[in-house]
Structures are given as C-alpha cells and as structure tokens.
Swiss-Prot record:
The lineage of its organism: Eukaryota, Metazoa, Chordata, Craniata, Vertebrata. Gene3D superfamilies: Glutaredoxin. Homodimer. Conjugation of reduced glutathione to a wide number of exogenous and endogenous hydrophobic electrophiles. InterPro entries: Glutathione_S-Trfase_N, Thioredoxin-like_sf. Signal peptide: none annotated. Residues 1-28 form the GST N-terminal domain. Belongs to the GST superfamily. Sigma family. Its EC number is 2.5.1.18. Keywords: Cytoplasm, Transferase. This is Glutathione S-transferase 5. It catalyses: RX + glutathione = an S-substituted glutathione + a halide anion + H(+). Glutathione binds at residue 7. GO terms for molecular function: glutathione transferase activity.
C-alpha cells in the first residue's frame, strides 16, 4: 500500500506540474 500511495502521489504531482506548465505556456 505504501508503494502504491507513493506512486499515486508522484503521478498526481506530475499531473499538476504538467497542468501548471501548460497554463503558463498558454498565458505567456
């Protein structure tokens, strides 16, 4: 479960970062 939770957190964090980069790219 710990490994799964870590993987989920990493994936979620990467998705958020990608969204932020995409938003920044569109804004600038």
């Amino acid at each position: 479960p710990n490994y799964k939770l870590t993987y989920f957190n990493l994936r979620g964090r990467a998705e958020i970062s990608r969204y932020l980069f995409a938003y920044a790219g569109i804004k600038y």
